[in-house]
From Swiss-Prot:
Coiled-coil residue spans: none
Protein name: Protegrin-2
Species lineage: Eukaryota, Metazoa, Chordata, Craniata, Vertebrata
InterPro entries: Cathelicidin-like, Cathelicidin_CS, Cystatin_sf
Function of the protein: Microbicidal activity. Active against E.coli, Listeria monocytogenes and C.albicans, in vitro.
Protein encoded by which gene: NPG2
């Protein structure tokens, strides 16, 4: 009888531990890839934007050297382009087509790969266009042309 009771108690503890393991995500499951962190930054840009249409990732610059700590801010540089989807639709930007002659923005800043910590520090500036076959990024009256 005592063995049966101990076995039943052990079974309950095993069940509780199993449920706890399923509920508490592991640290590795909480880490985002570099691209996922950038897509999260694009989502944040769309949430905070007052513009009519959503933006979608157009180009992602090379990720920085590997860093084991997902909570450490990583430098990031990417380009987004305006889509045909109105912002209020809340449609995932990846499902939206790019708008012909839509606005293009160059974004720089830092992201973390940790899903729990969510510090993003991103600044986006509109790309003013192409000058003599070169892509130019302008901020106020100062432009940098590449290419």
């Amino acid at each position: 009888m005592e063995t049966q009771r101990a076995s039943l108690c052990l079974g309950r503890w095993s069940l509780w531990l199993l449920l706890l393991a399923l509920v508490v995500p592991s640290a590795s499951a909480q880490a985002l890839s570099y691209r996922e962190a950038v897509l999260r930054a694009v989502d944040r840009l769309n949430e905070q934007s007052s513009e009519a249409n959503l933006y979608r990732l157009l180009e992602l610059d090379q990720p920085p050297k590997a860093d084991e700590d997902p909570g450490t801010p990583k430098p990031v540089s990417f380009t987004v382009k305006e889509t045909v989807c109105p912002r209020p639709t809340r449609q995932p930007p990846e499902l939206c087509d790019f708008k012909e002659n839509g606005r293009v923005k160059q974004c720089v800043g830092t992201v973390t790969l940790d899903q729990i910590k969510d510090p993003l520090d991103i600044t986006c500036n509109e790309v003013q266009g192409v000058r003599g076959g070169r892509l130019c990024y302008c901020r106020r009256r100062f432009c940098i042309c590449v290419g």
